[in-house]
């Protein structure tokens, strides 16, 4: 296969070495577990967290005479994912046997797809950032292919002092292996790419992306070269199950390779693992080539064939994907690129926001969801599905601001009460006397008292009009934050004779 270099060197991405600049070349193989009640070739459950070897059929255990039967739902999920990646859907694909020995691979081979995968080339637009100015940079990452394959079981080395056990619950679970082109040039780009893939699949409902459960793993191929030069020898870092660790592993591995090359050495093509505790990669074994696996078509499975009508029917069912949703939020609600990017990054966040924003000021809703709700959730380590404040409650708080019942400051206090205690925001405002003061007579009295108590500040304010803000703050403090801020501001300026 000829690898085409589609990107020109970017000075921002280069790594300075002792003998000049270096460029990192990164390609990823992402293994995504298909959301399906049954495995790829058997009816065994795919439920996470079951007792060891509870979800194992005779097919999964490779008992003699047991034949695989394709799970059509897994095929549909692969096609949906391919469509979400704007990729070519191949109407004919073939399952192959990939031969290697692992104790947790009962068949002695893995059923995968080699020369004829179900999905061909596609593209993903990845937003890298934001930078210090809050700007994102969009890059296009090519998808080489997506193919279906079986997962292996799990070897357990911590259950007995002298023996290893094998759990076959994962054996035969359907995986989509999504292979990128070598279009990534930094750890940050790689992290953004995996994040985007996960977001797309969560929107599609084809993979839950729970890396802590092993539903999404990545093999990271890293090499370095002089800017614009020939591709270097790559090393593969296996089974990365954290987006943060992917970035750390790439940064370490690139510097390791640069140090070797600058000392006059050469890079060995090998498979490595990342030690998150030590923050370093280390060698596992020499890297296998395709011929080492002795691929051949699986004689127990016919080629997988379907027509364009089958693909079109699935395409009609696809939900709105993150890029389309982001464009719509920017166009229809006037959101900034930054705010829209944050809101569509997780489907659950986007769904929550759209419920809050329905029939309301989109920018105000975005501000509350991003800064107040997500900010508080991050502090306490909760996700939005478990938010103590529902979309209806947050929407009610926004309504109270817009109709002048409460000020922005009171709204912050009300949000904290709803977060901690629950309840209907409008009823809480009534029962706790939280309505803002709109009676101009009462506000004027408070303004007069503050001005009378601070004659020296009055003269300063007339010389320096920005001092009016100090008076506004004092009046708000005197009224317990209940005075209408705009009314206070107008009265202060009028009383001080400030334009």
UniProtKB/Swiss-Prot annotation:
SUPFAM superfamilies: GatB/YqeY motif, Glutamine synthetase/guanido kinase. The keyword Cell inner membrane does not apply. It catalyses: L-glutamyl-tRNA(Gln) + L-glutamine + ATP + H2O = L-glutaminyl-tRNA(Gln) + L-glutamate + ADP + phosphate + H(+); L-aspartyl-tRNA(Asn) + L-glutamine + ATP + H2O = L-asparaginyl-tRNA(Asn) + L-glutamate + ADP + phosphate + 2 H(+). GO terms for molecular function: asparaginyl-tRNA synthase (glutamine-hydrolyzing) activity; ATP binding; glutaminyl-tRNA synthase (glutamine-hydrolyzing) activity. One of its GO terms (biological process) is translation. It is an enzyme of class 6 (ligase). Keywords: ATP-binding, Ligase, Nucleotide-binding, Protein biosynthesis. Signal peptide: none annotated. Its EC number is 6.3.5.-. NCBIfam families: gatB, PRK05477.1-2, PRK05477.1-4, PRK05477.1-5. Heterotrimer of A, B and C subunits. Allows the formation of correctly charged Asn-tRNA(Asn) or Gln-tRNA(Gln) through the transamidation of misacylated Asp-tRNA(Asn) or Glu-tRNA(Gln) in organisms which lack either or both of asparaginyl-tRNA or glutaminyl-tRNA synthetases. The reaction takes place in the presence of glutamine and ATP through an activated phospho-Asp-tRNA(Asn) or phospho-Glu-tRNA(Gln). Belongs to the GatB/GatE family. GatB subfamily. This is Aspartyl/glutamyl-tRNA(Asn/Gln) amidotransferase subunit B. It comes from Mesorhizobium japonicum (strain LMG 29417 / CECT 9101 / MAFF 303099). The gene is gatB.
């Amino acid at each position: 296969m000829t690898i085409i270099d589609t990107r020109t060197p970017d000075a921002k991405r280069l790594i300075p070495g002792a003998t000049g600049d270096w460029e990192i070349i990164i390609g990823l193989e992402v293994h995504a577990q298909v959301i399906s009640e049954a495995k790829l070739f058997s009816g065994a459950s795919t439920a996470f967290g079951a007792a060891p070897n509870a979800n194992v059929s005779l097919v999964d255990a490779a008992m003699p005479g047991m034949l695989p039967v394709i799970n059509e739902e897994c095929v549909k999920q692969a096609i949906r994912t391919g469509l979400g990646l704007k990729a070519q859907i191949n109407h004919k694909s073939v399952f192959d046997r990939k031969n290697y020995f692992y104790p947790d691979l009962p068949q002695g081979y893995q059923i995968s797809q080699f020369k004829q995968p179900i999905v061909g080339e596609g593209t993903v637009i990845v937003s890298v950032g934001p930078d210090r100015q809050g700007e994102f940079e969009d890059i296009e990452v090519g998808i080489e292919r997506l193919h279906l394959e079986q997962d292996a079981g799990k070897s357990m080395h911590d259950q007995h002092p002298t023996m290893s056990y094998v759990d076959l619950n994962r054996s035969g679970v359907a995986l989509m292996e999504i292979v990128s082109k070598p279009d990534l040039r930094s750890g940050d780009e790689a992290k953004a790419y995996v994040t985007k893939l996960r977001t797309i699949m969560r929107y599609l409902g084809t993979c839950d992306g729970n890396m802590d459960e092993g539903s999404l793993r990545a093999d990271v191929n890293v090499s370095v070269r002089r800017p614009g030069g020939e591709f270097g020898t790559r090393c593969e870092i296996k089974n990365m199950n954290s987006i943060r660790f992917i970035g750390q592993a790439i940064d370490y591995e690139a510097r390791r390779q640069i140090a070797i090359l600058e000392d006059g050495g050469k890079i060995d093509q090998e498979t490595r693992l990342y030690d998150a505790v030590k923050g370093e990669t280390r060698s596992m074994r020499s890297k296998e080539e395709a011929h080492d696996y002795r691929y051949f078509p699986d004689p127990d499975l016919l080629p997988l064939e379907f027509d364009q009508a089958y693909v079109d029917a699935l395409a009609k069912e696809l939900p709105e994907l993150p890029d389309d949703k982001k464009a719509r939020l920017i166009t229809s609600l006037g959101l900034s690129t930054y705010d829209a990017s944050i809101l569509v990054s997780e489907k659950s966040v986007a769904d929550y926001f759209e419920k809050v924003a329905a029939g309301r000021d989109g920018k105000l809703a975005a501000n509350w969801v991003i800064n107040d709700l997500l900010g508080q959730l991050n502090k306490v380590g909760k996700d939005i599905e478990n938010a103590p404040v529902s979309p209806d409650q947050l929407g009610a708080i926004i309504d109270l601001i817009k109709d002048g019942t409460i000020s922005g400051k009171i709204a912050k206090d009300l949000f904290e009460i709803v977060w901690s205690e629950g309840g209907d925001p409008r009823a809480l405002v009534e029962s706790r006397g939280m309505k803002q003061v709109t009676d101009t007579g009462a506000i004027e009295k408070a303004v007069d008292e503050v001005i009378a108590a601070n004659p020296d500040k009055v003269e300063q304010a007339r010389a320096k009009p920005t001092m009016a803000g100090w008076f506004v703050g004092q009046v708000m403090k005197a009224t317990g934050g209940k005075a209408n801020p705009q009314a206070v501001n107008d009265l202060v300026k009028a009383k001080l004779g400030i334009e």
